[in-house]
UniProtKB/Swiss-Prot annotation:
InterPro entries: Ribosomal_uS8, Ribosomal_uS8_CS, Ribosomal_uS8_sf. NCBIfam families: PRK00136.1. The gene is rps8. HAMAP family: Ribosomal_uS8_B. This is Small ribosomal subunit protein uS8c. It comes from Cyanidioschyzon merolae (strain NIES-3377 / 10D). The lineage of its organism: Eukaryota, Rhodophyta, Bangiophyceae, Cyanidiales, Cyanidiaceae.
Length: 117
């Protein structure tokens, strides 16, 4: 299991167990995805801690979070063919990690990492 999948699973499980904090593996991709979630108001804060990231969750903000592009099957999309979803998609583009709405505004496509609502 890759670190992004681990992070999403830990957030999902902590949210269901009503935990306030969760420790996830530290990586640059996890940090960038966590920053996007924080900017969108889905998590309260992210703090680096040794080899982990400490994420403070907001109660009942994330209803569902899932991995789209996996190591065995990468999913890419241009900004013109971005799928319509309930909630938002997090995209890794050449301009950085961002939501699918921001990618459409900037007219860049990329790898669809995960979805959240």
């Amino acid at each position: 299991m890759d670190t992004l999948s681990q992070m999403l699973t830990k957030i999902r499980n902590a949210q269901m167990a009503r935990h306030r904090w969760v420790l996830v593996p530290a990586s640059r991709m996890n940090w960038n995805v966590a920053q996007v979630l924080r900017e969108e108001g889905l998590i309260a804060q992210v703090q680096p801690a040794d080899l982990h990231l400490r994420i403070q969750l907001k109660p009942k903000r994330i209803q569902r979070i899932w991995r789209v592009s996996k190591p065995g099957l990468r999913i890419y999309s241009s900004y013109k063919n971005m799928p319509k979803v309930l909630g938002m998609l997090i995209i890794s583009t050449s301009k950085g990690v961002m939501t699918h709405q921001k990618a459409k505004q900037m007219q860049v496509g990329g790898e669809i990492l995960c979805g959240v609502y």
